[in-house]
Amino acid sequence: MSWSGPLRGLNTSLTCGPALVPRLWATCSMATLNQMHRLGGPPKRPPQKLGPTEGRPQLKGVVLCTFTRKPKKPNSANRKCCRVRLSTGQEAVCFIPGEGHTLQEHQIVLVEGGRTQDLPGVKLTVVRGKYDCGHVQKK
């Protein structure tokens, strides 16, 4: 039995005996030493971009100030936000979800990733019910 025995049932263009061997080599591009020297080897994958939490699910932070922001064009509201100094040393603007909050300066909050769609530049959200940020009150 020849080496093309198992391939006998396939398309005849693939099983034309020795003609298959050069096609296998043609698909594999091999770099010369000169090309490797010029191009510097295989391309390196750039490091994965991490968000403001640097790959962590949540971060602790201290509230620096609270304020309201206006959303982008089709929406209209006053979104409650706060500037937080994270445990990594960075400062970030965070969205405070829910109705009513009692956050003040120097209070400790837990912050998670998750941007607010209509607030440009706000990529973090305060977790309600953890540390100094209370739960949303029932009506």
UniProtKB/Swiss-Prot annotation:
Keyword vocabulary terms for this entry: Mitochondrion, Ribonucleoprotein, Ribosomal protein, Transit peptide
Transit peptide (first-last residue): 1-29
Keyword Mitochondrion among UniProt keywords: yes
DNA-binding listed as a keyword: no
GO cellular component annotations of the record: mitochondrial small ribosomal subunit
Region annotated Disordered, chain positions: 36-56
A GO molecular-function annotation: structural constituent of ribosome
PROSITE patterns: RIBOSOMAL_S12
Location(s) in or outside the cell: Mitochondrion
GO biological process, one term: translation
Signal sequence bounds: none
Primary localisation category: mitochondrion
The family this protein is said to belong to: Belongs to the universal ribosomal protein uS12 family.
Subunit structure: Component of the mitochondrial ribosome small subunit (28S) which comprises a 12S rRNA and about 30 distinct proteins.
Name used for this protein in its record: Small ribosomal subunit protein uS12m
Organism: Pongo abelii (Sumatran orangutan)
